[in-house]
Amino acid sequence: VEGLRILDIGCGGGLLAEPMARLSGIVTGIDATAEAIEAARAHAATAGLDIDYRCCTAEALAEEGASFDVIYASEVIEHVTDRRLFAASIAAMLAPGGTVVITTINRTLASLALAKVAMEYVFRLVPAGTHNPARFVKPHELRSEFAGTGIILDDMTGFAPRPARRIGGLHAEQVRLSRRRGGCGGCDRALRHRPRPALRG
């Protein structure tokens, strides 16, 4: 992680950004909610961490010509209105050989029960109305939406977090995407700065 330029899209209060900064990553966190950015900045200051938090969208940041080695968007794309534009913005910001990691909620009955019903109404871990099941994302839809951006699907893994870490667990799709020219493989390898050989074709 040391020295890697890392972008956390939809950073919220900095749950991912802070650990990456502690590992000496050069971290930028963006969120469209001003209150989240204010809270993230305050917490980072208290922890003595140097993180560049900005209240903006991925699309706006891409227009500035920003470039990153690792781009992470966790539980974000299912809230995006134009996913193809979102994918194009990520592609524009990804440095050659860089890695993108996306986690999102698969559109299944199990996900509906857990992410919508359980999380919002049973355990009340997120506000009611947070999730719109119509925007949950099927794997083949992600493949289609990222096609033509210069990013190819490298690895896709379905997972359910352990109940001890998140009540109920969400069935989701963890998608790792890498640029066709010199793509890194899985996120664990990318964050250790040990990329796989360049992909051909």
Residue ranges and their predicted role:
Residues 4-10, 99-123:
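Conserved class I S-adenosyl-L-methionine
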Residues 13-60:
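Class I SAM-dependent methyltransferase SAM/SAH-binding core
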Residues 47, 122, 144, 148-201:
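A C-terminal cap/extension of S-adenosyl-L-methionine-dependent methyltransferases
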Residues 72:
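A conserved beta-strand element that flanks and buttresses the S-adenosyl-L-methionine
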Residues 76:
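Hydrophobic adenine-recognition pocket in adenosine-nucleotide-binding enzymes
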Residues 85-96:
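A short glycine-rich, Lys/Arg-flanked "PGG" loop and its adjoining helix->strand segment in the class I
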Residues 124-141:
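Acceptor-substrate binding/catalytic loop of class I
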